[in-house]
């Protein structure tokens, strides 16, 4: 291989201005070039997005990323700078095609916030081979990340039993992924995020007050740590009011709680404990706060929490949780492992037959059956336009998302949050268990 082409960006310049069309894999473009050359580029096709299986032991997943995809589609372009780069390995006809590229196809799929299971046809992308193949990496980048985060977040929401959770993982992931993670967590039921960009871009409520550094900043050389903590708390209360949250574990939690109430009075909004035996410390802090008259002061805990440690704290006097690393890494499942497979050409089903990686052919839609109580019982995948006759309660899952390249779906976060909440309520009792198990409901596919 020869040397790489010269980069246009100088070292030290920001790297977040890459043309959206370049957020892809090279082989999408080399396939396009070959298809344009042999005349197959304009053949009508359908690509399907699905997961062959859930992450090990998971019982359901939560679809997230739909809104971000619809937001990204109009920006998925190849500008002059991008085309200059691509001309180094693509023929002129392909570069001309990319210069004028606009996705003008249709997309159907599950609404954002919908639950999914193995084989669920989460997205169906229709258009010419040329325009559909170019979207593969963009679609999978968004859905594999956001769905992994939302699926982990939903498990944490269930484990918290109605207590609020705050997403605090920005410093544990890429700066752009942090914004998407905050959005996905909020969809799944988190109450807020520490990320201000997520607030500005998506309206996710932002929470945050102070770190240990602020307390240590007030230490005097050789002076007692207790005085430093008091000074820090007084400064924070004077700036933010008594309803603020004071971090009480920089030195000693018992002393920290006393200093917090002394600084803010009985109207202190909350204390946060970020280390140690959180359950034990929360009990001790609750008793101490009540003795000091701060009976309405809330207790927030944080520090390497995941769904399992959150569940273990359900019996403790904890009012809310701050979750970082485990959330933004998918709590052990950093990708949803979704794939983007060609399932139809010229209206005729096609399918991959490789061992362990089979993908049923044909464009598909889905519905979900349930009992009269609302508890879901089965996911039924059927050929598009040919739904089976079902007399028991059911709900259609496949909805129009894009028509002729234009978004047509409601992608509001409020609607997605409501869909997640109702979906979790509809699961069978075993479906919410954190212990490893089979998918909460079976998926049955009617062949084309």
Swiss-Prot record:
EC number: 6.3.4.21
Family annotation (Gene3D superfamilies): Aldolase class I (3.20.20.70), nicotinate phosphoribosyltransferase (3.20.140.10)
GO biological process, one term: NAD biosynthetic process via the salvage pathway
GO molecular function, one term: nicotinate phosphoribosyltransferase activity
The keyword DNA-binding belongs to this UniProt entry's keyword annotation: no
Modified residues (Phosphohistidine): 212
Pfam families xref list: NAPRTase (PF04095), NAPRTase_N (PF17767)
ATP-binding in keyword set: no
Highest taxon of source: Bacteria
Entry's Gene Ontology cellular component terms: cytosol
Region (Disordered), start-end ranges: 1-21, 353-372
Alphabetized InterPro entries for the sequence: Aldolase_TIM, N/Namide_PRibTrfase, NAPRTase_N, Nic_PRibTrfase-Fam, Nic_PRibTrfase_pncB, Nicotinate_pribotase-like_C
Pathways involved: Cofactor biosynthesis; NAD(+) biosynthesis; nicotinate D-ribonucleotide from nicotinate: step 1/1
Reaction it catalyzes: nicotinate + 5-phospho-alpha-D-ribose 1-diphosphate + ATP + H2O = nicotinate beta-D-ribonucleotide + ADP + phosphate + diphosphate
Keywords on record: Ligase, Phosphoprotein, Pyridine nucleotide biosynthesis, Transferase
Family of this protein: Belongs to the NAPRTase family.
Job description of the protein: Involved in the Preiss-Handler pathway, which is a recycling route that permits the salvage of free nicotinamide (NM) and nicotinic acid (Na) involved in the NAD biosynthesis. Catalyzes the synthesis of beta-nicotinate D-ribonucleotide from nicotinate and 5-phospho-D-ribose 1-phosphate at the expense of ATP. It is not able to use nicotinamide. PncB1 contributes to basal NAD level.
NCBIfam families, sorted: NAPRTase_put, PRK09243.1-5
Name this polypeptide is given: Nicotinate phosphoribosyltransferase pncB1
Species name: Mycobacterium tuberculosis (strain CDC 1551 / Oshkosh)
């Amino acid at each position: 291989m020869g040397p790489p082409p010269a980069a246009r960006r100088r070292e030290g310049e920001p790297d977040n201005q890459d043309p959206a069309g370049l957020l892809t894999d090279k082989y999408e473009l080399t396939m396009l070039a070959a298809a344009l050359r042999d005349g197959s580029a304009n053949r009508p096709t359908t690509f399907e997005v699905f997961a062959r299986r859930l992450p090990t032991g998971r019982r359901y997943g939560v679809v997230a990323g739909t809104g971000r995809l619809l937001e990204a589609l109009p920006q998925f372009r190849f500008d002059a700078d991008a085309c200059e780069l691509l001309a180094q390995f693509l023929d002129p006809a392909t570069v001309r095609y990319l210069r004028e590229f606009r996705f003008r196809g249709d997309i159907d799929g599950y609404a954002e916030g919908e639950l999914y299971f193995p084989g669920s046809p989460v997205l169906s992308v229709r258009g010419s081979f040329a325009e559909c193949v170019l979207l593969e990496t963009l679609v999978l980048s968004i859905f594999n990340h956001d769905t992994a985060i939302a699926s982990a977040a939903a498990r944490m929401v269930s484990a918290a039993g109605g207590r609020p959770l705050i997403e605090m993982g920005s410093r544990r992931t890429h700066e752009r992924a942090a914004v998407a993670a905050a959005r996905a967590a909020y969809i799944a039921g988190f109450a807020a995020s520490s990320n201000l960009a997520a607030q500005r871009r998506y309206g996710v409520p932002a929470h945050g007050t102070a770190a240990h550094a602020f307390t240590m900043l007030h230490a005097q050389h050789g002076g007692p740590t207790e005085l430093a903590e008091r000074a820090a708390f007084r400064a924070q209360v004077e700036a933010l009011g008594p309803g603020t949250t004071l971090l009480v574990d920089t030195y000693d939690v018992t002393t920290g709680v006393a200093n917090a109430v002394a600084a803010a009075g009985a109207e202190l909004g909350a204390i946060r404990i970020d280390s140690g035996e959180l359950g034990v410390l929360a009990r001790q802090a609750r008793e101490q706060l009540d003795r000091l008259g701060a009976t309405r002061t809330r207790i927030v805990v944080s520090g390497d929490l995941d769904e399992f440690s959150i569940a273990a704290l359900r019996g403790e006097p904890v009012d809310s949780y701050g979750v970082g690393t485990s959330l933004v890494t998918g709590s052990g499942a950093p990708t949803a492992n979704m794939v983007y497979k060609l399932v139809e050409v010229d209206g005729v089903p096609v399918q991959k037959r490789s061992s362990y990686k089979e993908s049923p052919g044909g464009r598909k839609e889905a519905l979900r059956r349930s009992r009269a109580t609302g508890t879901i019982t089965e996911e039924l995948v059927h050929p598009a336009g040919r739904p089976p006759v079902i007399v028991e309660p059911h709900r259609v899952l496949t909805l129009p998302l894009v028509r002729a390249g234009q978004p047509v779906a409601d992608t509001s976060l409020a609607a997605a949050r409501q869909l997640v909440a109702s979906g979790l309520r509809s699961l069978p009792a075993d479906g919410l268990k954190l212990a490893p198990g089979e998918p909460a409901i079976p998926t049955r596919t009617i062949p084309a």
